[in-house]
Amino acid sequence: MMKISYHLSLLCSFIYLAGCQKNGEIIIMGNGLVIEDLVIGEGSEAQDYNKVVVNYTGTLEDGSIFDSSLKPGGTPFTFTLGVGSVIKGWDLGVKGMKVGGKRKLTIPADLGYGNNGAGNVIPPNATLTFEVELLEVEVY
């Protein structure tokens, strides 16, 4: 009975904290995804099946940038949330953001490119960090 009470208390705490978004808040998900709200947006909220437009910068554990929409000649990236068109860490980490918001996502390998990595840019089993800014949400 005490074990159930503990788990219920933990669940209630998580639900409470999930509703208290503020700048600098860090959430560590059970799957290892770390979400840090850098700026809380005030626009539309991104949900599954919405088309979203983001600016992003991706870095490896050593801090080296492997990709960015902000590089010279870069453009914002558009994708449909929650349909698997991007790595799982993005689908999970962008969901719930509001337009104008910025998040730092630290994505473990199994929610990124896993054992295979990606070309010669992302090594196998790499933890990735993305700073993502939500620019637009289009509801279908």
What are these regions (language model features)?
Residues 3-9, 16-140:
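Cross-family detector of peptidyl-prolyl cis-trans isomerase
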